[in-house]
Amino acid sequence: MNQRILSTLGFDKVKQQLLQFIVTAQGTNEVSELLPIADENKIQSWLNETQDGLKVQRLRGGIPIPKLENIQPHMKRIEIGADLNGIELAQVGRVLSTTSELTRFFDELSENEVDFERLYMWREQLEVLPELNRQLKQAIDDDGYVTDEASPALKAIRQNIRRSEQTIREELDSIIRGKNARYLSDALVTMRNERYVIPVKQEYKNIFGGVVHDQSASGQTLFIEPKQILEMNNRLRQQQIAERNEITRILAELSAELVPYRREITHNAYVIGKLDFINAKARLGKELKAVVPEISQANHVVFKQARHPLLNPEKAVANDIVIGEEYQAIVITGPNTGGKTITLKTLGLLQLMGQAGLPIPVEEESKMGIFTEVFADIGDEQSIEQSLSTFSSHMTNIVSVLKKVDHQSLVLFDELGAGTDPQEGAALAIAILDSLGAKGAYVMATTHYPELKVYGYNRAGTINASMEFDVDTLSPTYRLLIGVPGRSNAFEISKRLGLDNSIIEAAKQIMDGESQDLNEMIEDLENRRKMAETEYLEARHYVDESAALHKELKEAYQVFFEEREKELQKARKEANKIIAEAEENAETIISDIRKMQLESGQQGGVKEHQLIDAKTQLSQLHHEETKLAKNKVLKKAKEQKKLKAGDEVIVNTYGQRGTLLKDNGKGQWQVQLGILKMNVSEEDMTPVAPQKEAKPRVTTVRSAESSHVGTQLDLRGKRYEEALAEVDQYIDAAILAGYPQVTIVHGKGTGALRTGITEFLKNHRSVKSYEFAPQNQGGNGATVVKFQ
């Protein structure tokens, strides 16, 4: 980009705004070197960095970077063997400590899974030097003062200095506060030539002896070092020399420590400067209420609600500026003072800012193009130095532009063709626009020539525009109206200001018919635009209202669905809890019956297989999480069929099959669910067809009346499910028979059956213990079970 256009459009002023947010010397260099470029990949990288900066600004208030000086000269000096002073070492130390702090800052963001496009790349380039950082912090404070902790020797020397100073002060205090005080000009202790002295009146200079170091301007006071403290001052001076030598040694040592790491330190300062620059761009974006634009792959410019960045964001009027989609040339017509030039500059400056990677004051989803050059001929940059006329000045610039322009250029012309005969000027303006159009350039031009209003209608890829004017307030609104050519509004303004209506009508008659028709056409277009805008706003209102209603209904449905599922789940859990309690009670009752049979010696009570069947049916009552309540077919069948005793139904709450016993009235029925009898509402039942009678089940365990139960159960060759069912029945029968222990033979095989039996025995309430059989009785191919 040529330097002239940057100044014309105000890019340098934007850089000055950016500098306000820079805190490091390297960051200042970044701003100074900032220029718009045309490399898409590099621009995208810059914009990504700006987006990252805005994200940090939003999440953490910005990147924590303190004020840092330029340390590059320091690194060059130590490279040639020079030593740094305390202030310079402190500046290097701040770079090292900032490096550590930034590393921790970005690591914390990474741990919190905050994503960035580019910032983590810069963080990876920071080289933390903890030991060097520790040494500098310990030895040098922020002001460059060498601390007592820099070395044990320095600490001891300074302790001696403080003691010597205390002794000297005490001695001098005794002099100035004793009987000799009358010989002094003032009762104070001061310093001359780095030695402690007292102010003695001229006439008493021999009273104290010692050395005269200075006298007052009047000569009436001599600053004397009394002989009593000569030796003390000498000793103090020696200690101060020792301190200076030790400090020099420490500074040299620390400077030497930096030499091997000078490249890392220099690069750290460079990276911190980059981060400072990114941070400043984000802070500028926040102040301007700016966003990062997208790069248009079709090279279109779509700036939504664009504002000029150098105007007060609270007062600047925002406008939509679009060029490149349906048209590549915008001709803004109409009178001066309406904001045409500002609109022109806004387009150019925002495009330059975007190509420099800066945020721009537009709405989200705005798009920028990429131009190899931006050219401008603005009315307020006439060449007074060259004593050229307005027309000559403009034409000189235009000739230069036409020689360089191509299809990747953005051209901005203010008052094209002005400064000469209107007819000739308008003709030249049209010819220049045609020439630019033939080269494929993107153009925005302002003019007050009426001939160019027609041009916007007749040329493909060109559109008229104007700046809105409020006739009621007689002031411009600064709103850009695309598609509507401008008009002077002279008749309307004159009428509102009180000009006689007959004069206005006479003026209209004088005005040629073609111009009058054009103005009427423009007025009609403007009225149509206002109507379309009103209709659009109404339609937008209805669309927004519908979208809000849709969102509310969707959320309400989701809440309803979730609440319904919660209630169903709650009912299932409650049902399972009731059945679990019933099962536990049934188990206790069955156990008690067995004990009573054993104690009484009765063998003809309840048959064993009946007890087992009852327990199995009870277990089957556990509620499966079915969706029977949603089955519309079953619901319809229930409504069509009248219920009667003996019918089979599904109890919806539990999802289990049962048989109706009797009608309790009021829509309530007694239902047999396995071994349980329950009262159930008709609404909670769905009629089903009766099940076919199942074939009698063959079991290996029989009641005490009909079969003898052995002390050993052989399961070899049985399927897994069949074997476990048989074990369950066998254990119950063996307990009923009164056996203290039994043996279950399962074989070795793959171990699956053995594992399953072990799990079953582990959870059986009547089993006391179990273990594999002795080796001579089957080993791990059989399990010995002992009962309670």
UniProtKB/Swiss-Prot annotation:
Its EC number is 3.1.-.-, 3.6.4.-. It is an enzyme of class 3 (hydrolase). GO terms for biological process: mismatch repair; negative regulation of DNA recombination; rescue of stalled ribosome. Residues 713-788 form the Smr domain. Keywords: ATP-binding, DNA-binding, Endonuclease, Hydrolase, Nuclease, Nucleotide-binding, RNA-binding, rRNA-binding. Endonuclease that is involved in the suppression of homologous recombination and thus may have a key role in the control of bacterial genetic diversity. Belongs to the DNA mismatch repair MutS family. MutS2 subfamily. This is Endonuclease MutS2. The lineage of its organism: Bacteria, Bacillati, Bacillota, Bacilli, Lactobacillales.
